[in-house]
Amino acid sequence: MADDNLLLYSSGLKKVLQMPARHENNPVIPNDKPWELAIGYCSVHRDPTTGEYACWYQSYAGNRAQDPTRRVTLCYATSKDGLTWTKPKLRLFDFNGDLDTNIVLVGNGGRSVNYGASVLFDPTDNQPGKRYKLAYWDFTENEGLQTPGLCVAFSPDGIRWKKHSKAPLLQGSYGEPTQPPFSNESDHLPAGRPAISDVMDLMWDPVNEQYCIYSKTWIDGPDGRRFWKRAVARTTSKDFINWSQPQLILSPNSREDHQFHGASIFYEGGLYLGLLQKLDLG
């Protein structure tokens, strides 16, 4: 719900929060492929010329995958109405030998958690090969260590992606370092804090003319304990390669609060609006 910033007069008006209704045929994109044990973290774009929708979503295969780079992948689907979706057989990446998949990006190897991907269509980029931009979380081997953090890729059509040669662009922190298989993560945590984590949402900020990533991060507890609760951090870039030190922008304020698992931000009508992901662990 927006505030009264754009209302000249409000006398006699009553604010009513419209409750969305779940579609009766949900899920409209079912996890019905061998590489889709579970799916989530979607980016949707509507082509203004054709009216067709494109959706990029994370697919988790886990131990079904014979190749570790296929444990978590980025998949692609299209729709004319946003309700009936088609998963094209792109034949770009196989899954356990089957090339008839809709996979458009695979992991880096190692721990290979190609996670929390977010896609942005950027029609103003004068390089056609970079009209589609992708930010995602993955591990990269550096000096014998599997270092997690921000990775990016570019595409002319949203289907054929080229990963940027440098990764990670920002080192991140996955989470609680005492939980296996991350028991040694505390040995090489990011120098700067807060650090990005494995949920990312991209936007183009037209006011400040910069790219923004709103990412899950971790905050310390009142007792100084690390990785106490999830919160939201923001990092910015003018060129999509060099990113600022993340800044904490939203965090839980009590032990009873839900955790903040991420936020999708967009600019509309002179306002920055956000959809907050709240995590309730019960």
Where are each of the predicted segments found?
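Beta-rich carbohydrate-recognition and catalytic domains
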Residues: 1-258, 266-282
